[in-house]
Amino acid sequence: MLYSLLRPLVFALEPETAHGIAFNAMETAHRLGLYRARPAPCRSRSIMGLTFPNPVGLAAGLDKNGEHIDALAALGFGFIEIGTVTPRPQPGNPKPRLFRLPQANSIINRMGFNNNGIEGLVANVKAMDYKGILGINIGKNFDTPVEKAVDDYLICLRKAYRYASYITVNISSPNTPNLRQLQQATELDSLLGTLKLNQQRLADEHGKYTPLLVKIAPDLELPEIDSIAALLMKHRVDGVIATNTTLSRAGVETLPHAREAGGLSGAPLAKRATSVVARLHHALQGALPIIGVGGIMDAAGATEKIAAGASLIQVYSGLVYRGPHLVGEIAQVLCNANGGGLDGASST
């Protein structure tokens, strides 16, 4: 109720300014103990060797540097993913680079992996009180040639490994030049081979196995999805996140800002993202879990992702448009389904 009253004021501000103000307010409320969500009664679920208290996660992109983990955790998330982080700090693309399309409950962004670098993120993670499941989403610096991208991923993998519950390899942002080339079969085969080899070395070194996931785009043809699924299984990748933002403007073509460059998230992405989840589920046959994300604006949207084959879901734009209560709303519905558990894909 409070968020619905405040939203018009927040939306009157430039989006990145509003983002900063919202986080400052959330941090203040958290420090004063003014809010703490009551998690929905839920049977915890073991996926990738991790115990998830509920299936609702925060997607990467909202807290790029891991500066607000404790405050976000108080909203009742079952897991939190921070990043995307790169080896070196970078400012991202010039502003303006974030645009709301409120008529369609959607957002266009061309942020360009603005972040303070992996060392800054790790310092924030080490300072947090949060003891829940934390994903760290890693990417390459904008000026790293795509043929050298593996070097950037390795730097981030090695520095984040000890502190992450799982690590997501972002090869699908549309806002870093040529990044999506890494979804092509030859490039992805090589990248996954190198990352999995180093994952095992790090597991031996630290006595801790940190699952490795890959985040893919929604703008893939069916044969491309099948090819990616085959490579994920070949390299025994631990999970897949579907999907990132889309370059499509279907359904929003006439709206203000629709022609802005960048990736579209929010309600118009829902059907496309769900279809990718369903195709992955068919191709993977339960071999690894899917985290469904893209256009989830309510519990019904989350249920659709689970029905399509996702084991867990993540929200971002829905949180912006619906407010913090969305987390508990979705968790309550999903946790009440099937006696507090979920069906979805493999939970191994």
From Swiss-Prot:
InterPro entries per record: Aldolase_TIM, DHO_dehydrogenase, Dihydroorotate_DH_1_2, Dihydroorotate_DH_2, Dihydroorotate_DH_cat, Dihydroorotate_DH_CS
Alphabetic keyword roster: Cell membrane, Flavoprotein, FMN, Membrane, Oxidoreductase, Pyrimidine biosynthesis
Root EC class: oxidoreductase
Keyword Cell membrane in record: yes
Textual note on the cofactor: Binds 1 FMN per subunit.
Residues the entry annotates as binding FMN: 60-64, 84, 137, 170, 215, 243, 266, 295, 316-317
Active site annotation, chain numbering: 173
Membrane topology: Peripheral membrane protein
Pathway: Pyrimidine metabolism; UMP biosynthesis via de novo pathway; orotate from (S)-dihydroorotate (quinone route): step 1/1
Complexes and interactors: Monomer.
Family under the similarity heading: Belongs to the dihydroorotate dehydrogenase family. Type 2 subfamily.
Described purpose of this protein according to its UniProt entry: Catalyzes the conversion of dihydroorotate to orotate with quinone as electron acceptor.
Protein name (Swiss-Prot/TrEMBL): Dihydroorotate dehydrogenase (quinone)
Gene behind the chain: pyrD
